[in-house]
């Protein structure tokens, strides 16, 4: 390296003498200067080994960022809004403003990467500070002036312990306060928080990884050349953009409906690379020109002028917590054409973008056949439920404690008499309005009361519109529920809630839950618009709490559909069991007319809810899942044909699914287990242990763990899955096959926190464990092996310090 690139060379002996004198002087002046004296701030050895050839971002830098940095810096809740999942996120830098702020009085300006600003200069105007030195011309200054480098260097200078828990004072809680220092503030930050370099609260980078990142930063953080779309992919993009940009009123209305439901998706072309995805956006430029996205808070916001629907390659890394894939294919295109264009109907005018119309899909899309709309949603029901599980609304208790820890979802058949009666839905559209039409406001009590009245009017009008001969025999009532034609696995879903995150799987998984949702078209559509299309993560406290309160109403309606299937004599007992404790009166706000009227007859036992679940499992047949023992068919069910290691591990873990009681409160909500077989790593087995916490009710907005409020620890249990489930693992366990029975026995023997700590010390992978990254890498690779299209980078923000 040229002498012009850094201070003049100093012989080692003289350097040590000078460094000692400088350190002594600095010690007399201020402890901060001693902590971060100049020789420590920059790695001269790495500057001396700086390669002449540029470090390639895509092939050399991005894999390191994805495996070590994106695990925490990948979404709205990335610390300091520093999104390291894309080069543009690094160039944008960080911000002291937080996205998730449920108490703000005024809505915040949106800061969505690739949408709300397109250049670094625009982000600076929005208050983002650089983490790269954007002006430096020599390697030394590029490092010394880079907050990102200084964070990495701080961790090198102050590595964390190699055993035990993290040092006191390091907060890894979800709502921890972030410092987000600028370059001018960094010396103070490093002095006050010397053990909070990057990776934060996790082991250091490997030397080769650290060297690659430092060399890349010293070279000026060059980016790779933009990728060119493969010809076959470009052809499919052109086909879909042509379909979405038709000029007739019918084509434009259908395209708007599709956009407002798919805007959050990771669109994948069948037959292409499993890691290639696109996003559907509105652009001011037509197909064939560079995309210029139109930034509106919500997908139904007024575009303000002419626009085109465009498919944009999904930029950046695929992150599990916001990855909701949706397949595009020639067959899908043909199906959509048949669904929306081979039905006889007319569109006389396009709906406005005024909030009271645009936020109400029953008004905006009244011209589209109800059967087509509902069929579109049912075909990929998991995608639309995942929208609110993985969308911006997903983070935190205020959003998710409206749901149970595990419950099933089923759907009414689109061809049943009530579901196919579009006339009454059109007539009741005004009653189906939701608080999202008011956007940001602080009228919490009056808003809740207003929309609750609309809900009751809707339910009463719906009762009058139901032309069913009641009561129905059980077999006929079961026929009103969709079975997916016997082939569509979206006919039944299981939702797992993990305190402040959640996940969705196909099938009825685990033991029969306390509650289930039976959804019809109006419910499914309202959930999407309330929690996905209409939810603004940058909105004020009024918007966020009104959203949460109204979701309570929708959840109760969905659960009431289950109650309607039960005999009248048990409904109140079941209903009251869902709403105990401090919120016992809340459900009385909605009083179903049928609570004392038998609607379904033919039960043969004194446990009708369990009997109903048994019938549902039988009706769905292979579409319901029994995780352990694993499903099999033919010779595969012969124990001699199944690997002995798999049988041994499955038999051991099956015992955990029968665990009950208060011990669960000591366990992580989501734990990943790797059973090491001793051969190739990819042959090892993966399990997920989910804690199903029991609650007196799920209607309290806050105070998740206040004793006596909502928790009923005696009803806690475990769900064990022979695959990886969840985007936010809270702990890893690595178990040799030879110890799998011991692992289960000790797990089953946990009675208190001390027992759990001893168990963790033997089998767990703590944040301080030098093998932590090896474990994380294996689980990320395993997720890709299990689901090549659906998998994304796991998020470690919720990983516990135990």
Show where each model-derived region lies.
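N-terminal secretory signal peptides that target proteins for export/translocation
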Residues: 1-10
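Residue-level detector of alpha-helical transmembrane segments in integral membrane proteins
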Residues: 4-5, 24, 258
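Aromatic- and Gly/Pro-enriched helix-to-coil junctions and flexible linker segments
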Residues: 28-802
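N-terminal non-cleavable signal-anchor helices
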Residues: 9-11, 22, 148
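Bacterial N-terminal signal peptides
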Residues: 13-26
